[in-house]
């Protein structure tokens, strides 16, 4: 058990020498202490006898809390005795309940701990996820908390920061007042994933007694942006504004449900025209240096996707004359076509040419939603659609497309009615 005590820096015992030569320590009287307490702003007015004064009488804070823990002696000064006593009591309670944090550790800055956290990230998660975390750390977290000691990060301050993220007043990239509000989904990632993860590391190392982010409240999620489901006619209108190869790419997106990054990572060898399937095992992403890379699909799950017969000729056209290791959808000069280039140079110009660029919510991902709507219309059940689209769970599929499944409660009642025996 650690020992703690409070020391009066201004007053000391007077030493009296008796006739026999022995020494007696005489503490200051209650009257002396009361007088000094009444004149803390001007100690000389208390008229404390010199014999009770220390060498630092009237200088700095009057009270010092001393304690020993982890084999070291520590101290903290206070002007007010009650605050010193409250600190000492809380200190001993923290030690008894294993919440004690060495003051030196509490003075570590958030930025110092973040560097350790970053080192632990490398190789433990996908490069694209690492890149997103580091970007959020650099843009939003470090500008506010990088230089702040761990011991000064509290729930109230973190909650005020969340309010700034919502309003757009939070420091960003070291600059203040950029007027860029964050969406609730982004705030959750910045606060409850990145910021919290660094503080979790501090807690696990004993540098913080508890994570102040645990009690922080986040803004409620806003309704998901309206999903756009295209008709086959609308898909063709867009494809008709592209060259033949990219038109086939649009048809693949709309009628197989693969993501754009997955499509652009497909090799010719990933296509099996005997079984009419695509083997989706890679997708495009970006690394910490913002370079396009290939990684595993979302959720680290590979899958096999069926190809409608109507796409056979188009796929054969894309693969004609190209080896199994070559990309199925290629850049104009061959090689990898990046998602950004395809969006900027192929997709967006085609939308403008088709007069569809002002449709709210229409993105490349709308082609994937279109596939889901057509599959459900064709009778696909939840588990089948989940497997084809690569969702993490059937619940995700339901949450995303629940509005597309028809309400068949009437049919159920009619079917059960046929079984009733009265």
Please name every model-derived segment:
Residues 1-119, 123, 131-135, 139, ...:
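Basic/aromatic DNA-contact patch characteristic of tyrosine site-specific recombinases
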Residues 59-60, 173-196, 204-266, 274, ...:
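Basic, Lys/Arg- and aromatic-enriched nucleic-acid-binding interface segment
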Residues 69-74, 93-103, 115-128, 138-225, ...:
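N-terminal core-binding DNA-recognition domain of tyrosine recombinases/integrases
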Residues 81, 221, 284, 389-415:
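Catalytic-site neighborhood detector that most strongly recognizes the C-terminal catalytic loop/helix
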Residues 110, 114, 126-129, 133, ...:
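Hydrophobic (often cysteine-bearing) scaffold residues that line and stabilize catalytic clefts
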Residues 171-174, 236-247, 256, 305, ...:
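Short, basic (Lys/Arg/His-rich) helix/loop patches that form interaction surfaces
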Residues 240, 275, 284-313, 317, ...:
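C-terminal secondary-structure termini that scaffold catalytic or DNA-interacting sites
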Residues 270-277, 361, 380-402:
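Short, polar N-cap/turn motifs at the start of nucleic acid-interacting alpha helices
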């Amino acid at each position: 058990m650690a020992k703690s005590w409070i020391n009066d820096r201004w007053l000391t015992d007077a030493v009296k020498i008796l006739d026999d030569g022995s020494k007696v320590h005489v503490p200051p009287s209650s009257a002396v202490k009361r007088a000094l307490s009444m004149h803390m702003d001007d100690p000389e007015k208390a008229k404390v006898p010199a014999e009770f004064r220390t060498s630092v009488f009237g200088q700095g804070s009057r009270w010092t809390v001393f304690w020993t823990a982890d084999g070291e002696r520590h101290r903290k000064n206070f002007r007010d005795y009650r605050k010193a006593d409250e600190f000492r009591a809380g200190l001993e309670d923290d030690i008894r309940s294993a919440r004690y944090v060495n003051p030196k550790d509490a003075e570590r800055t958030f930025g110092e701990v973040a560097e350790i956290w970053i080192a632990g990230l490398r190789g433990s998660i996908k490069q694209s996820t690492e890149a997103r975390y580091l970007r959020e750390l650099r843009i939003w977290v470090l500008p506010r908390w990088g230089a702040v000691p761990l011991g000064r990060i509290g729930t109230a301050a973190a909650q005020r920061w969340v309010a700034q993220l919502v309003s757009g007043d939070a420091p960003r990239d070291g600059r203040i007042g950029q007027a860029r509000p964050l969406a609730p989904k982004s705030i959750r990632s910045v606060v409850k994933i990145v910021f919290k993860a660094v503080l979790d590391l501090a807690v696990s190392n004993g540098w913080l007694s508890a994570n102040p982010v645990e009690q922080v409240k986040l803004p409620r999620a806003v309704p998901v942006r309206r999903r756009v489901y295209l008709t086959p006619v609308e898909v063709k209108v867009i494809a008709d504004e592209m060259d033949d190869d990219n038109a086939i790419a649009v048809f693949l997106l709309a009628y197989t449900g693969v993501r754009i990054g997955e499509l652009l990572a497909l090799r010719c060898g990933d296509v099996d025209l005997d079984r009419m399937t695509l083997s989706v095992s890679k997708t495009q992403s970006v690394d910490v240096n913002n370079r396009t890379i290939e990684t595993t699909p979302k959720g680290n799950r590979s899958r096999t996707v069926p190809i409608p017969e109507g796409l056979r000729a188009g796929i054969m056209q894309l693969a004609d004359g190209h080896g199994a290791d070559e990309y199925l959808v290629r850049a104009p000069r061959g090689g990898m076509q990046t998602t950004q280039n395809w969006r900027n140079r192929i997709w967006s110009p085609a939308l403008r040419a088709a007069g569809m660029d002002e449709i709210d919510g229409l993105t490349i991902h709308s082609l994937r939603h279109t596939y889901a709507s057509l599959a459900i219309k064709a009778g696909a059940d939840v588990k089948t659609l989940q497997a084809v689209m690569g969702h993490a769970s059937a619940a995700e599929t339901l949450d995303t497309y629940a509005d597309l499944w028809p309400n068949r409660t009437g049919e159920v009642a009619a079917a059960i009615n046929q079984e009733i025996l009265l």
